Amino acid sequence: LGLVLPRQPNTLTTDAKDGFVLWTSPDEFMIDLPGDPVAHGAAADGAAARIEALSEALATYFASVVEVSDQMAGIGLGGSYWREVWSKVSALDLHESQFAPGACAQTLAAKSNVLLYAPDLRSDGVRQIRLYTRRSFSQYLFLRLEDAAQEYGVTLQAY
């Protein structure tokens, strides 16, 4: 896939065009690939080919590859006051000294299980985080974050 595995737990590696690999637990990695998760036609064939290639590469290991894009929903949180918004829904400290770019974690946010990670700065130089939650909790979490963001003008993005 053109991606390297992280060497430390709770971190990620990235290649802007190829995606992210997150080390989420001692025996689990999550790979976030660019593109439309509900693609059809050639795009879907390309995603299937990448999954097949990874499965073949791991065939000699005690490992499995599971495609979960339908299970998870993504939310991007960015802007000048995104930490203040986050602190309204979770107790996890995301100050840069504790959660620098390249970090990932699993925690609760507004009673929802989330996997979050901090990629590098956006193209406009603003820090951001990306969250994944179960699709069944996504609307609830998005609305809670949207409510918390109103007073700060923080941007939310569903993906």
Predicted feature locations:
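Basic, glycine/lysine-rich polyanion-binding surfaces/domains
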Residues: 1-159
